[in-house]
Structure formats: structure tokens, C-alpha cells
Regions:
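Multi-pass alpha-helical transporter architecture, strongest
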Residues: 161-188
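Intracellular juxtamembrane helix-capping segments at the cytosolic ends
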Residues: 104-118
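A late C-terminal transmembrane helix in Major Facilitator Superfamily
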Residues: 122-150
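A membrane-interface helix-boundary motif in multi-pass transporters
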Residues: 146-167
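Helix-loop junctions at membrane interfaces in 12-TM secondary transporters
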Residues: 82-96, 105
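Structural signature of the two symmetry-related core transmembrane helices
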Residues: 67-82
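Short amphipathic helix-loop junctions that connect adjacent transmembrane helices
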Residues: 20-37
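Helix-to-loop junctions at the C-terminal end of transmembrane segments
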Residues: 51-65, 148
Length: 188
């Protein structure tokens, strides 16, 4: 159960980096104005919405929850790495579909999480998960904005590699998750 709570914290914390740093980074890296920043965030939101609405079910059915989570982490990590080194703003729009693969990770994790405890403990478990998400929403913006301001003069894209590093912490946790009966049956 603890690995699932930590994963929720990691995924929530990394999600905070976008809202905290995206506009500053776009302005610093590409001299984007408000319209360009808004268009990029809008494209990001549309891709994420479509991915979360259309991909998790088929991905979990095809790959299983653990692999779907890992595909989500891999897609986001690849996109963030491209963003870190991107030399032109159009590259960010081009990578959005890959970025959207991250949209399958959290729904797969949520599905897996509901089977980690019995029915009688669901309320308590959901409360613990909500607390982890709340803690991430407090800690992550402070951490990522501080790191951004330390690195923005030398390399604004460094912030995205720091997010990849945090996602990297999730991989061994995902690999170590115990599969419950439903996923074992689906993989057979």
C-alpha cells in the first residue's frame, strides 16, 4: 500500500511542475508571449484530455496496469527530455501526442490502487491518497519553482530533466507493485 501512496505523491508532484514553470520556461526559452503560452497549455490540455478519455481502458486491457503506468511514465519522460533540449517552440507542439501518453498512467494507477485494500478500508485509503496529493500540491510548486529560478539563467530546460528524475523514482516502485488477482487473470 505504501508504494501506491508514494506513487500518487510522485505523480501529483510532477504534475505541479507544469503549472508552476511552464509559462516562465516558455517565456525564457522561446520568448513566448501570453498567446503562445496559452496556446501551448491549451494544446497540452486537449491532448491530455483525449488521452485520458480514450487510452487508459484499451492500454490496461492490452498491457495490464503496471505496464500502462510504465508506458505513461516513459511517454512523459521522453517528451520532457525533448522539451529540455528543444531549440524552437514548434517542437513543443510536435511532442504533445507523446506527452499525452502520460494520460494513461494515473488512471491505471487509480484502478490498481482501488484493489490494494478491502472494501471496508477504501474510505481510509482514499483519504490517505488525498493527503498525499495535497502534500504534493504544497511541496512541489515550492521545490520546482526554486529549482527553476536556480537554473533558468544557465539552462531553462533543466527543470524538465528534474521532473524526469522524479518520475525515475516511480519506476522501481511500479515494478515492485504486487499484482492483485484481477490483473494476473488479465495477463494470463
Amino acid at each position: 500500500m505504501l508504494p501506491v501512496v508514494i506513487l500518487f505523491f510522485i505523480f501529483s508532484a510532477t504534475g505541479e511542475a507544469y503549472g508552476t514553470c511552464w509559462a516562465l520556461w516558455g517565456s525564457d526559452a522561446f520568448h513566448w508571449n501570453g498567446l503562445s503560452i496559452g496556446l501551448s497549455l491549451g494544446a497540452f490540455g486537449i491532448c491530455q484530455t483525449l488521452a485520458q478519455a480514450l487510452l487508459p481502458g484499451p492500454a490496461v486491457k492490452l498491457l495490464g496496469e503496471r505496464a500502462a503506468i510504465l508506458v505513461g511514465v516513459a511517454g512523459v519522460s521522453l517528451a520532457l527530455t525533448v522539451m529540455a533540449f528543444a531549440g524552437q517552440g514548434w517542437m513543443i507542439f510536435a511532442i504533445m501526442p507523446v506527452f499525452a501518453l502520460g494520460g494513461i498512467g494515473v488512471p491505471a494507477l487509480q484502478s490498481l490502487a482501488t484493489r490494494q485494500v478491502d472494501e471496508n478500508s477504501q474510505g481510509q485509503f482514499q483519504g490517505v491518497l488525498a493527503s498525499a496529493v495535497s502534500l504534493a500540491s504544497i511541496v512541489a510548486p515550492l521545490a520546482f519553482s526554486s529549482l527553476y529560478f536556480l537554473t533558468r539563467q544557465q539552462w531553462p530546460g533543466a527543470i524538465w530533466l528534474s521532473v524526469v528524475a522524479v518520475y525515475g523514482l516511480a519506476v522501481p516502485l511500479v515494478l515492485g507493485l504486487r499484482l492483485k488477482t484481477a490483473e494476473r487473470a488479465a495477463m494470463s
